[in-house]
Amino acid sequence: STYAAAGRRLPRASLRVRIADATWPIEAVRAVPTYRRQAMGLHFIKIAVVYLVIGTMLGAWMGSIQTFTYAPVHAHILLLGWVSLAMAGVIYHLYPAASDTRLAKAHFWIHNLVLPPFMVVLALFLTGTKAAGPVLGIASVVMIVGLACFMVNVLTNAKPAG
């Protein structure tokens, strides 16, 4: 940890948590390794890379058969999967206070539970399945809820260091 790297040891008493008044000494918070505080950002970046590979493979497949019916799916996978999640990961990595929130976790799970079926339903809609339209609308609204979690989280919890 940063605190330990500075050559200082935490006094044993400062690591105790008093349950009665639920206070944490600031030294105990500083003693938490950086990787644990910023783990949410890394989760976003890792899953973003998965979407990058999927989107790239879809694009290569469409190019190889010269059929671009699924171009909107390709674009959505890369923009909502790769770009937006990678950017969120970088923001959460730079602002660990925003990373350690329920909103960050809600954003991660909503986004990643909705995006894959959203892409399947979009593909069905593009190939003429009209019944996919209402499901596509619902998935879009849920995706917006996930992105709203991100917006509220960043606006309220992303603070400059120091």
Each language-model region and where it sits:
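Hydrophobic alpha-helical transmembrane segments of multi-pass integral membrane proteins
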Residues: T2-A6, P11, V17-I19, T23-G162
